[in-house]
């Protein structure tokens, strides 16, 4: 299973019952952005990587799941590096199709398949998962102060602590060991993973905080992704809206990409740290282990392990 896809439970069931070798296929409105299946006599005959728009060999793309047995593992040995410097499982599948009939399993119409290869795709996937989770259970197991207010569907896991004068608006997920408050505000579609923290006078809006991420005081985290064990200094703010209300762009592999979103904050990699009173522009990415000095306005991406000093803010 590729790590950059999100699929529903029905997809796993369909693949588990399929005969090996088999691959998952999906229909998308932009097939030229993916590996497109070549079909021969109704079966799989190979994959064309990112064909020219309008010249796709079919309307099915390789959807990131493969089922094989030990009989097929040799096809994945000694693969050459592709032009983009990766070992492509699709090359092995194309070779395999010359010797075996490879079954095509389509994503069931009643189920979901999402490409989550871009940072903002996680927001769509997390909403689907949160909706699924709230259908399974809507529970409050953690320690909730009688002076806190909870409205709407939420999951608050065992070991979480909701302190006085905190307001949580569902749908929301509060994981085990999470600490919220006092005087904090968690808005709809927020997900706080285990041992993360939203402290005094902090607001979390439609954001994802990964394990151990800390927004301990006077922070605004809007439409943002905060990686594991990030620590945000007091007063760190993520801007999530342009003055002109236009869609926000993000740099992906060196190119500016229109996300199509009018609300999008920052993407902060694991173990990064910000000093006090840091302001981060919409669509900015901060790499893992980066340091942002106090008082800085961050207008550009910061590389993994980078150090951003305030005199760089105007460059």
List PLM regions with ranges.
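Catalytic-core segments of class I nucleotidyltransferases/pyrophosphorylases
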Residues: 16, 44-131
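Extended, small-residue-rich solenoid/repeat segments and analogous flexible loops
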Residues: 88, 94-185
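Hydrophobic/aromatic residue at the end of a short beta strand that borders the catalytic acidic motif
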Residues: 1, 6-8, 68, 232, ...
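Conserved beta-loop-beta/alpha segment of the NTase-like Rossmann-fold superfamily
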Residues: 1-41, 77
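Glycine-rich hexapeptide-repeat left-handed beta-helix
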Residues: 198-315
């Amino acid at each position: 299973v590729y790590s950059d896809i999100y699929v529903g439970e029905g997809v796993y069931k369909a693949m588990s019952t399929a005969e090996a070798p088999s691959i998952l296929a999906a229909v998308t409105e932009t097939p030229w952005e993916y590996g497109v299946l070549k079909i021969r006599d109704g079966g799989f005959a190979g994959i064309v990587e990112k064909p020219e728009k309008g010249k796709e060999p079919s309307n099915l793309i390789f959807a990131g799941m493969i089922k094989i047995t030990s009989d097929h593992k040799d096809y994945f040995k000694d693969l050459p590096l592709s032009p983009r410097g990766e070992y492509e499982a699709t090359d092995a599948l194309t070779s395999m199709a010359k010797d075996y009939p490879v079954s095509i399993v389509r994503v069931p119409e009643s189920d979901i398949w999402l490409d989550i290869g871009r940072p903002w795709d996680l927001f769509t996937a997390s909403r689907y998962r949160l909706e699924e989770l709230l259908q399974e259970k809507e529970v409050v197991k953690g320690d909730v102060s009688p002076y806190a207010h909870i409205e709407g569907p939420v999951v608050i896991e065992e070991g979480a602590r909701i302190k006085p004068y905190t307001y949580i608006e569902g749908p929301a997920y509060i994981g085990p060991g999470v600490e919220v408050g006092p005087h904090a505000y968690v808005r709809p579609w927020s997900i706080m993973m285990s041992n993360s923290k939203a402290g005094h006078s902090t607001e979390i809006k439609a954001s994802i905080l990964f394990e151990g991420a800390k927004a301990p005081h006077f922070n605004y985290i809007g439409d943002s992704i905060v990686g594991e064990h990030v620590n945000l200094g007091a007063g760190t703010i993520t801007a999530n809206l342009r003055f002109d209300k236009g869609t926000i762009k993000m740099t992906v592999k060196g190119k500016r990409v229109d996300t199509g979103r009018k609300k999008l904050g920052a993407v902060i990699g694991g173990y990064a740290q910000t000093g006090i009173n840091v302001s981060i522009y919409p669509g900015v990415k901060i790499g893992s282990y980066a340091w942002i000095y106090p008082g800085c306005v961050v207008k550009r991406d910061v590389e993994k392990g980078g150090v951003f000093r305030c005199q760089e803010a105007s460059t």
